[in-house]
Amino acid sequence: MQKRQLGNSGLEVSAIGLGCMGLSFGDGLATDKTAAIELIRRAHALGDIFFDTVEAYGPFVNEALLDEALAPFRDKVVIATKFGFAGGKVSDGVDSRPENIRAVAEASLRRLKTDVIDLFYQHRVDPAVPMEDVRAR
C-alpha cells in the first residue's frame, strides 16, 4: 500500500487508514469482538498502518480493542485518537478545556497500553474554549 507523510509531523501513514468507529459505536450494534480483531489484523496484513479511534467510540472500549488487535505489531502502526467530548461521550457535549485534554490523553494511553499517542487531535470544536488554549497544551 502506498504511504504518505502526514504534514510536517514526520509520521508516515498508509494512504488508506481504518476508521474504527463502526466496530463499537455508530448505527446498529457493535461488531463482535473476535470479528473486529480479525478485521483490524486483516487491514494491517493488507498494508494498512493507520488506525483512527477515540474514547467516545463505545464509549471507552474502542481504544482497548485496537490495543488488543495491534499489540503484536504496535511499533509498526500509527494510531490516532481524539479528545473533545465531555465525559468521553458524544451525548454529553463538547469539552476542550486543557484539563480535560490532559485527562483524555492519560486515559487513552492506559487503554491503548502505550506510552505514546502517535496522533492526538480535536474531534469537535468547543466554542467555549479559545483555540489558543486548546493548542497550547
Model-assigned labels for residue ranges:
Residues 55, 63, 82, 106, ...:
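Acidic-residue sensor for enzyme active/binding pockets
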Residues 22-27, 86-92:
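A short acidic, helix-capping loop that chelates divalent metal ions and anchors anionic groups
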Residues 76-88:
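A short, structured active-site edge motif that brings together acidic residues
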